[in-house]
Structures are given as C-alpha cells and as structure tokens.
Amino acid sequence: MAKALITYASMSGNTEDIAFIIKDTLQEYELDIDCVEINDMDASCLTSYDYVLIGTYTWGDGDLPYEAEDFFEEVKQIQLNGLKTACFGSGDYSYPKFCEAVNLFNVMLQEAGAAVYQETLKIELAPETDEDVESCRAFARGFLAWADYMNKEKIHVS
C-alpha cells in the first residue's frame, strides 16, 4: 500500500479543514495516510513516504507562518529525489500576496529535487461552500492521477 503524508500549518483551522478534506478523499483510494501538524513533523521523515502534500496559510504580506519556518528550512537541506509532492493552503484576498506561502513551498520543493504537482490549491479563508469542498477533492484526485498512482494500482479516479 502506498504511503502518503499530509502536513499542514493552520492558525484558524482553515488549512486544517482543507487537509482533512484531502485526507478523506485520498482514503477512498486505500492509501496509508498520516496527517500531521507541520510543527510536529520531522522533515527527515519525508523520504519514507511515496507522496507528500504540504498545506500552509500565509502570514502578513506573503510570509511563511512561524510554525512552518523550521520545517521549511529543514526540507531545503534534504535531497528529495523525485518525491511526488503537492502544496495547498488558505488565504485572504484582502492581503496583496494571496497564498504566497503556498508558492514559497512549491518553489522550495522543486529546488530540493521533488517532483511537484503544479496545480496548487488555494482556498479563500475556509472551505465552506460546496464548490470549495469539491475543489479540495478535485485537487486530491488530480494529484493522484498526476502521480500515476492509478496506473500502478489499477485504480480509476472519478
């Protein structure tokens, strides 16, 4: 069984809500999933997973949240060798750099050698509408299809 990690930073609970919608969707495909807050995550464990999804909110004018800074710096030091990854997060359009921390993680993962799903998921505040929830679910399914999981395991994503 393929192993996936979803790790996230969430101050208001919005990014955590997104993480759990993604987790619930991925569980439909019988993945072994760990869902862990980012400040409880040891970056050296990333390479023990087949898939890693990182979620974050953006602090202030485009900064990483405090609780994600150490993890971010630790991951930069690891060679990820094609590890399949994706980034998601929540933000507020009233700030000039909407969900910029998601972009920062996306670029850093590429620089660390990960294979990065280029379709990031960015939700305004909380995933409260049916459309937001479906966007989260579609992101999870799209990531799996991109990662070629379906072909390996003969599972059809619907």
From Swiss-Prot:
Keywords: Electron transport, Flavoprotein, FMN, Transport. Pfam families: Flavodoxin_1. PANTHER family: FLAVODOXIN 1 (PTHR42809:SF1), FLAVODOXIN 2 (PTHR42809). The gene is ykuN. The lineage of its organism: Bacteria, Bacillati, Bacillota, Bacilli, Bacillales. Low-potential electron donor to a number of redox enzymes. Residues 4-144 form the Flavodoxin-like domain. Belongs to the flavodoxin family. GO terms for molecular function: FMN binding; oxidoreductase activity, acting on NAD(P)H. This is Probable flavodoxin 1. InterPro entries: Flav_short (IPR010087), Flavdoxin-like (IPR001094), Flavodoxin (IPR050619), Flavodoxin/NO_synth (IPR008254), Flavoprotein-like_sf (IPR029039). NCBIfam families: flav_short, PRK06703.1, PRK06756.1. It comes from the Bacteria. Signal peptide: none annotated. The keyword Flavoprotein applies. The keyword Electron transport applies. Its cofactor is FMN.
